């Protein structure tokens, strides 16, 4: 998980929150790395996804998820428009103390656009739609706000953790040819 080339302090805090909340994610300081160099770094670290948070007026504006299949330029597979962010420190929530082995579970609260976002979370973050029996998990609770917008709250052990997001659906959220 990384940022655009010259991130604002708020973007850096957001990436820190999000990488601490999503199981298996790690934060990488981008610097002047190109996408190809990010792909090579991901392969070295054993990752198959690169998450890049873009900026809009100093705030998170878009989350792009890329699939890493080799050292060449990664493919953009999922994009989310960020309409609003509330960082964990602003809500006085903590970050989860993940022990390893946890998974991300996407739980839509209603049908329609929340289900579309849950499917996109499965593709982007290897989330599951049902919690596992034995392992711990971080739950991404996805609630529809209107026909194109959802609110995402992360929970660990039933308590809210990490950032709270309002995400919008771009014209093409899941890129062609990608299925759950």
Curated annotation (Swiss-Prot):
Keywords: Ribosome biogenesis. One of its GO terms (biological process) is rRNA processing. Residues 1-178 form the Brix domain. Transmembrane segments: none annotated. InterPro entries: Brix, Brix_dom_Rbsml_bgen_prot. Probably involved in the biogenesis of the ribosome. HAMAP family: BriX. This is Probable Brix domain-containing ribosomal biogenesis protein. It comes from Aeropyrum pernix (strain ATCC 700893 / DSM 11879 / JCM 9820 / NBRC 100138 / K1).
């Amino acid at each position: 998980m990384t940022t655009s080339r010259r991130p604002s302090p708020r973007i850096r805090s957001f990436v820190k929150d999000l990488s601490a909340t999503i199981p298996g994610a790690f934060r990488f300081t981008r610097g002047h790395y190109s996408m190809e160099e990010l792909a090579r770094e991901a392969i070295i670290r054993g990752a198959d996804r690169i998450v890049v948070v873009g900026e809009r007026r100093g705030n998170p504006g878009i989350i792009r998820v890329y699939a890493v299949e080799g050292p060449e330029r990664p493919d953009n597979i999922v994009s989310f428009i960020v309409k609003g962010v509330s960082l964990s420190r602003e809500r006085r929530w903590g970050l989860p103390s993940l022990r390893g082995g946890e998974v991300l579970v996407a739980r839509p609260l209603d049908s329609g656009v929340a289900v579309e976002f849950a499917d996109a979370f499965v593709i982007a973050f290897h989330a599951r739609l049902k919690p596992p029996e034995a392992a711990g998990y971080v739950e991404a609770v996805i609630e529809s706000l209107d026909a194109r917008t959802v609110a995402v709250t992360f929970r660990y052990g039933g308590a809210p953790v990490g950032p709270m997001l309002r995400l919008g659906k771009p014209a093409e959220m899941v890129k062609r040819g990608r299925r759950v």
